[in-house]
Structures are given as C-alpha cells and as structure tokens.
Amino acid sequence: MAGTDSPAAARFVYRCLLFAPAIVVGLLLPLTLPPIAAAQRHTASDNPSTYNIGGVLSNSESETYFHTIISHLNFDQQYVPRKVTYYDKTIRMDKNPIKTVFNVCDKLIENRVYAVVVSHEQTSGDLSPAAVSYTSGFYSIPVIGISSRDAAFSDKNIHVSFLRTVPPYYHQADVWLEMLSHFAYTKVIIIHSSDTDGRAILGRFQTTSQTYYDDVDVRATVELIVEFEPKLESFTEHLIDMKTAQSRVYLMYASTEDAQVIFRDAGEYNMTGEGHVWIVTEQALFANNTPDGVLGLQLEHAHSDKGHIRDSVYVLASAIKEMISNETIAEAPKDCGDSAVNWESGKRLFQYLKSRNITGETGQVAFDDNGDRIYAGYDVINIREHQKKHVVGKFSYDSMRAKMRMNINDSEIIWPGKQNRKPEGIMIPTHLKVLTIEEKPFVYVRRMGDDEFRCEPDERPCPLFNATDSTANEYCCRGYCIDLLIELSKRINFTYDLALSPDGQFGHYLLRNNTGAMTLRKEWTGLMGELVNERADMIVAPLTINPERAEYIEFSKPFKYQGITILEKKPSRSSTLVSFLQPFSNTLWILVMVSVHVVALVLYLLDRFSPFGRFKLSHSDSNEEKALNLSSAVWFAWGVLLNSGIGEGTPRSFSARVLGMVWAGFAMIIVASYTANLAAFLVLERPKTKLSGINDARLRNTMENLTCATVKGSSVDMYFRRQVELSNMYRTMEANNYATAEQAIQDVKKGKLMAFIWDSSRLEYEASKDCELVTAGELFGRSGYGVGLQKGSPWTDSVTLAILEFHESGFMEKLDKQWIFHGHVQQNCELFEKTPNTLGLKNMAGVFILVGVGIAGGVGLIIIEVIYKKHQVKKQKRLDIARHAADKWRGTIEKRKTIRASLAMQRQYNVGLNSTHPPGTISLAVDKRRYPRLGQRLGPERAWPGDAADVLRTRRPYELGKPGQSPKVMVATPAMLGRTRPQQNILPPRYSPGYTSDVSHLVV
C-alpha cells in the first residue's frame, strides 16, 4: 500500500478515510466512551511525571526545531511544573495517508504520546493530516495542526480532537466585513466555488454580518451570489448576470486556477477596470493574471512553521500545567489495536487546549469552540503593476481593546483603472422611479379630466397604478414635495417617473401568511413596501424618519423638521342664560347676597338701639320721617348696592350712617369689578383649547366622552407603540384610528372626533387655513421628514448634500411660506381673535330673563295680595255684620230693660196706690231668671248667644208684643213661685253682669 501514489488511488483512500472513521467514531464512541465527568480529588503524585509529545512534521528542519523547543520547554518554569519532563516523538509526514496512519500507531501511540503536532506541505493536500486526525481522534489524543486550513477540519463530528494554530480559509469573511465597513460599501456580489470551503465562507459572511452590523452604521447587503463549479473553463455566463446588477464590489473565494479563469473573462467584459472593486482571498491573490488594483488578504506567518510549532508546544504545555493542578491525568493509550480504550483525560485535555489564550510568536493564540485559531493577523495586499504585491493595511489584534482592528492606508491604494480615488462601488442609475402620496399641503392630487392631456405648469403627472390589472389612472400632483423633487432633479442631475402609492398608505410592518407558507412573515406595505422590495428608487413625500423605517431604508437629512401635536376644534363661546353671572364665582355671589341682608339687619339694630335714633327721641317732630324699620333697612342696602336712588328710610343715628358709608364704598368696588369682568367675559374673552397637550390627564386616562385617534400604521402610530408610558392611551385610541389623515380632520371639524394626533406640519397648516381649528399643547416626539431611498442607494449622499444646501440658501424656508404657512389666512385668524365680540341676545338673554322673572314675580305677588285682600274683606264684612247685629241686639236689650224698669216702677206705684195685687207678686219680666220652670210652662223662648249650650231661654211670643207696643206683663202668684228649682242650675242671661260686648264669636 506504500506504493499507492496515483491520484485515483489517493482519492479513493481519502474517501475511505473520510467516511469510514466517521462512521466508526459516530457509532462506537457513544457506546464505549462515557460523557466527560468532573475531575475527582487528586494529588500531584497521582499524575505522570513524563509526557511524550508527538510530532508529524513535513521536513527534517521542522523535526529538529521541534526537538529543540521541547528541550527548551523543560527549563521554562512558567509552563512546566516541578518534576515534570517533556519528551518529543516525531515522524515524517508521508504523502500516503494509509502509511501515515500506520506510522502514527507504531511510532507515536505505542510510545504513549499525550498530544500530536502535525504539519504538511501546502502542495501535498490535506489527506495525510486528516489521517492523523482520524487516528488520534479515535483514541481521544489531541492533535494540533499548524498548516491545515480546510473547512473540513472544523467539523467536530469527524475531527473530534483537532485544533489548529492557523485559521481556516473561510474566516477571511470576517476580514471582508471589516473592509466593507471601512470603505462604506453597502452592496456586494459574492463569488465562490461550490466546494466545502466556498460554501463555508458564504455562510460565515451571512451569519457574521447579522451581528456585526449591530455595532456599525453602514450595513452591506448581498445583491447577488455567484456559485461556480471548481475547475472552471469559462465564467462568461455568470459575468452577464453580474454586469446587470447594481453593485460593482466583488468578493471572491476561488482557487488559484479558478481565479485565473475568472480574471480572464472579467477583463474581456471590462469588469476589472475603473469603477469596479475586487476583494479576493489568499489563493486568488496568487493568480498570474490578477488585475491591477485588486485587494487581497494574506495571513501573517502563514509559512512560518517554526513559529507555529513553538506556539503549539507552549499552548500544549500551558494546558497540561493547568490540568495537572486541577485533576488527575491518566496515562495515554499505548495499544493502537485496542478499540476498547477510553482515554477520558484526552478529552479533558482537549477542552483545556481550547480555552488557552496566550501571546505567541505568531501573535495572539486563542481558539473558538471548533478549535480554530482566532485573533489571526492578516495583511491587506494591493496588486500593483507587474503583479507586485504592496501591503496597504493590517488586520491585527489590539491588546488594549482585546479585539481585532482594521488599519488601512487609503492613500496608498491604487484602484482598478489606476485610480487613486475610491470607487463608488455601485452603478448609479440616472433615471429613477419616484413615489409619493397625497398629503396636504405637501402633495395635492388632482385627477385629470377626460379631455385633458397634460398637467398645469406647476404640476407633474403622477399616475396611480392598479396592482391587480396594471392599469393606471392619470393624476396631476403639485405641492411642497413636488417643488422639492423638481429642484433635486435639477441640482443632482437625474430624471424620474413620478407615481402615487398603490394603496394610498405610507406603509407599516405586517405579519402575513403567504399562500402555501407554514409560517408568518413580516412585510412592509404602502410606500415602504415598494421601496424595500426595490419596486421604487426614491420616496419624496412627508415620510417621517423613525427607527422602524430606518432599519430597512436609507433616509436623507430632514428637509422639514417637525413633531407631533394635537388638533381640535375650538370650543364655542358659552353664551348661557347666566352669562352675566360669569364675572363672579358662585361663592362670591353668595357672599354678596348674604352681606346685603347682614348689613341691612345691622343698620336696623344700630338705628333701633342708638340713643339718637327716632325710636329713642320722644320729642321728635311728627313731621319728620318715620323710624328705620327692618324693611326699610333691607331696601336701603339693596338700593345702595344697585346704585338706585334712596328716597326714604335712611338711617338717622351716626353709627348707622357710618356703616352706610362703608357699605356704599363696598358697593362701588363690587359694581366696578363686576362691570370690568363682565366686559372681559362677554366681549374680549377668547375660548381656550380643551386639552393642554399630550400629558393632559383626560388623554392619559381616556374617558368615554373624549375620543382621540391617529392614522393607523403611520409613524405616529409607531411612536405610540414604542412609548411604554402611552400604552394605556394607545390601547384606547387604537380602535378609533383612521385610514387617512383627511378623514380624521373632517371628523374634527364636524365634532365627531375631539382630538386628532398627527404631524405638526399638517395640523399647523389646517389650523392656519380654518380659524375654527387649533393645535393644543407643545410638540412632542420631534423628528423630521426625509427623502427615502433604498438601502445602499448611491443617491443618498447626493440627496443629503443637496437638501443641506437648500436649507442654507433659504429654499426650504421659501417652500414653507408658500405651501404651509398661508400668511394672509393666518393674519385674518389673528384679526378675528383680537376683534371684540358684539353682544347679542345670546350673551344678554339672562338679563332679560331676569327682568321677566321680576315682572312675573311682581304679577304673582299682586295676585296673591288680591286674593289675600279679598279674604280679609270678606272676614271684615262678617265682623261688621256681627258687630251691627250685636249693637242692634244691645240696643234692644237696653230698651227692654228700660221698659221693664219703667213697668216695675209703675207696678210699684200702682201697688202703693191701689193695693190691687196681693203681696209677693212680681213681674215675670223681672224675676223670670229666678223661676225658669215658670218660663218653660209659659212656652219656648229664643236661644241667645252667650247662653249655655244645655240651657234654653224660653220666651213667650206674646211677651214681647208687636212692634211699637209694650210687652204684656204676666203676674206670678206665690204658688207658682213655690215650684221653682234650685238656684245653682241657672246660668246668667246676656243682660246679667257677666255679659260682654265682644261679638267675634258671632262671626261664622
């Protein structure tokens, strides 16, 4: 088998070595080797005192140096503990991998090597190093390569214990990213072979770029990936696709032979001349036809075997020293034929090796998880005339920052076409597709009539393309942004086709489920979607610059600085029925009312108890004014307050008059203050806004009667999503959001929407145009409007510089005055604000109603007085009738008494003269009260008021006689008198001494 040198046999052996050991390792090792366990407690005496280090080297010189380094290592106490000695065991690398395997078993493993250092000549291929890795890895013996750079050695499923002090070829992708960031290139084309290393470098570039660009401002994107089969014969087909791409920066990984074919064909297509940039890997740099101006990379110390041998030995010694101090090291395996060997210490040693980080002869030596060298330095090579290689930069380790750093001297670079100036790296198109959107006053859109064939001079055609049937509706656009676009095209020299946003939206980020897709995918809609998907080159519209959009597109410097504000309708003047009461608060009105009556009461008391008041003056003239009563005092207090004339009822005492003067002064101040404030409230006052700004409590804690909204998917909508403190407000307003700003503004005018939150430029324009609208509070969320371009667009810097020049020249200020701030309209609004209101019925209706209430109150009171007076008159009339009846009855009684007295006198006279009647007889008219039973027998009499309820006085009708006649007198005999009842049951009659003249009880 030693004579198997043909390429076919070598490839066969390589495949066998590639797959067979992998299968064996994959199937047997999980069954025979337990997982790595933690080291147990040990002592220094448990570890071996001698360690054999194997070497599979490419030449005798390397073997000699390896022996020397091991000898010197034993005297370095920094790396070698006491009582520990290292010995070297070396063999020569054979081109035959099978022979190499046997040599490793017989000459290295049989001598208990703890690790193997392997190198080979670059021209011999990687079959022999792979054989060493397979064999040693099977027994968990670490292998340190110093020259193998293929990507296959990074696969730890196959090369389980392989490390290397050189980086793999595909690590050059890291240097590519640094170079692109340095030159600020944003679009690239990657050319790579379809082998393992070619695909590895592409994957490394794509993976690393995702995290690399988080720390830098300029992001490079891959516009085109060109993959070719090795052993090229022609590259023309791929060059055609590359020529139509926009990028002119080519990153190439290819072997030296393939690079020659690519450079040959690219030169024929004039793609290696001025304006093109080629950045290639180490192998391509050695092509014999590399064009002038090509940039390439070359690994530092790539061919310094001695340096790598020394670094690998010291890395190994450092790992063994730390392992000795931490755990017990078992002896290395000795029998290559024993497949059951499980050297756990070898696996642990491999982990210690990967964690090393030392400063070696080839630079900073450290490893990643795959055992590949990191912190490797590169030279940046510039190909000059006659294939001369000139170092123009270095990619080296910065010990202060503990990271790699790129340093390139741009002035020393000669670019393709022998140019000293860095190419743009991109083909700059001069005819652009520009999109805009209707948004007053920045863009006014007018549909063309059927008979119109062109727009007005200040307008530009802006068709609206239908996404479903690709038809276009013809429109004309003008406004702030259209004038800006016209001036930009003149200044930086490009032509354009203008069109409207297909869906009429600025665009927002949506999760969409594409047909047949299993997962959701985020996509931009509207203007943003057109630009991100490269269906447009530029957006000239009031497009707010925010982080969400800046992640996917480029923005120029702002052409208009603005913020977010709130638009609301001005509250109408409150012309209520009690408008005249507005100058004073309710509390003050109550105090004034109370003061009037308190002062009136005090005036009355002062005048009542003063010794100089009319109540105390006994000799006062009867012609003088009457004393001040309480009613007059109240009248006086009200009269002074209302400034009416006081004709009567003024206080007389000095103390009361002093109080009256003070009250008059108080009334003067109150009336003057009321008059002044009434004018301010009814004439000069302008209503304020309902909201104080975004921090208004009514917005933060939205009530049912307060509605606020913005445009869904807009930059304002994104702003509210970002602000945590506005989350409650956003959840409330999200359901009210509108599709367009125009709809929301119309609803504000109609009163359907209380607050519309939008860009300040648009809302200030609306407020200046309509005096009924006003912006509330200060600006918040300050940002700006910018021109949107594709990521990496070559026009970004030119547009930015042009906009800055426009600001300096005053052109932007001119656009502001022309389109946003309508001076005459705003002046009219200010004049309207300052003009006093003419008082109308609405303003003073309350006063008239107050007068009406007074009149109605007076009428009501007079009706009550009339009714009361009628009642009093009726009562008085009844009293008069009763009094008249009583007087008449009294007269009758007196008359009867007189008659009876005269009759008694006559009877006495007759008795005395004639003695006709027997003694003891009296007139019943006189003694009837003493003999009621006699009266009862004589017949019933009338009942008189004043008699007891149970006693009836009887009076015989004939007793009174006829009118004009004297009553008849009945003479009672002693027998009749003897049948009388006891005296106690008799009540006195009206004419008895108990009689009273009060007749009020007679009134019914």
From Swiss-Prot:
Query: This chain belongs to which protein, by name?
Result: Glutamate [NMDA] receptor subunit 1
So what family is this one in? Belongs to the glutamate-gated ion channel (TC 1.A.10.1) family.
The residues exposed to the Cytoplasmic compartment are: 607-663, 865-1004
Does the keyword section mention Repeat?
A: no
Q: Which GO terms describe its cellular component?
A: NMDA selective glutamate receptor complex; postsynaptic density; postsynaptic membrane
Record keywords, A-Z: Calcium, Cell membrane, Disulfide bond, Glycoprotein, Ion channel, Ion transport, Ligand-gated ion channel, Magnesium, Membrane, Phosphoprotein, Postsynaptic cell membrane, Receptor, Signal, Synapse, Transmembrane, Transmembrane helix, Transport
Work out whether the entry's keyword set contains Signal: yes
Q: Which organism is it from?
A: Drosophila pseudoobscura pseudoobscura
Q: What is the membrane topology listed in the Swiss-Prot or TrEMBL record?
A: Multi-pass membrane protein
Q: What is its main location?
A: membrane
Q: Give the Gene Ontology MF terms in alphabetical order.
A: glutamate-gated receptor activity
Q: Which residues lie on this side of the membrane: Extracellular?
A: 40-585, 685-843
Its subcellular locations are: Cell membrane; Postsynaptic cell membrane; Postsynaptic density
Pfam families hit by this protein: ANF_receptor, CaM_bdg_C0, Lig_chan, Lig_chan-Glu_bd
